[in-house]
Amino acid sequence: MIIAIDGPAASGKGTLGKRIAGHLGLAHLDTGLLYRAVGAACLAAGKLDDEAASVEAARTLDVTTLDPESLRTGAIGEAASVVAARPGVRAALVDLQRRFAARPEGAVLDGRDIGSVICPDATVKLFVTASPEVRAERRFKELAARDPLASYEAVLADIHKRDERDSNRAAAPLVMASDAVLLDTSHLGIEESFAAALAIVERARG
């Protein structure tokens, strides 16, 4: 069973993916971390504008060394959005994601193009979204715990910018797969969102 969860930045898809995977005993891959890791590598090398360097970083990425906490900063999130728009980076990471999904028992993957590009034959496809304001508030609370200088206005502006870039990039733009189920979490808490998502998964399992 492959469960594909897509959606824009800070929509809650990663939290849902982790919860669903844990509940069903499946492996989970937050594919956004892959792009964050590539973005972080480029930032560290001072080569965010170097497309060849970003493609090489994607090709040599070791998923076993990913550190979610260190990768969840505003600067790395912005860098991830930049490198994710590059076809060469996406191509380098597609095979890695598909190998992960090909586990005999199945897997849960969340990202921007799982249901539309990576796993078009997924058993279940969810498209998780929320209003930009709600997503900005969620991301702001995450960042404020680590960065006292974080501001809601800056986070909201970043959300709008990332939405624009994700939706209009040439390589695998953010789109809802035609056979995906829409889940709007604007007015749902974590537990309510999980219950709604799990109900969709259970229906698909029959």
UniProtKB/Swiss-Prot annotation:
Cysteine-cysteine disulfides: none
Transmembrane recorded as keyword: no
Keywords: ATP-binding, Cytoplasm, Kinase, Nucleotide-binding, Transferase
Family from the record: Belongs to the cytidylate kinase family. Type 1 subfamily.
Subcellular locations according to the entry: Cytoplasm
Protein name: Cytidylate kinase
A GO cellular-component term linked to this record: cytoplasm
NCBIfam families listed in its UniProt record: cmk (TIGR00017)
Gene3D superfamilies in alphabetical order: P-loop containing nucleotide triphosphate hydrolases
Keyword Plastid appears in the UniProt entry: no
Matching CDD domains: CMPK (cd02020)
GO MF assignments: ATP binding; CMP kinase activity; dCMP kinase activity
Entry EC no(s): 2.7.4.25
Binding site for ATP: G7, P8, A9, A10, S11, G12, K13, G14, T15
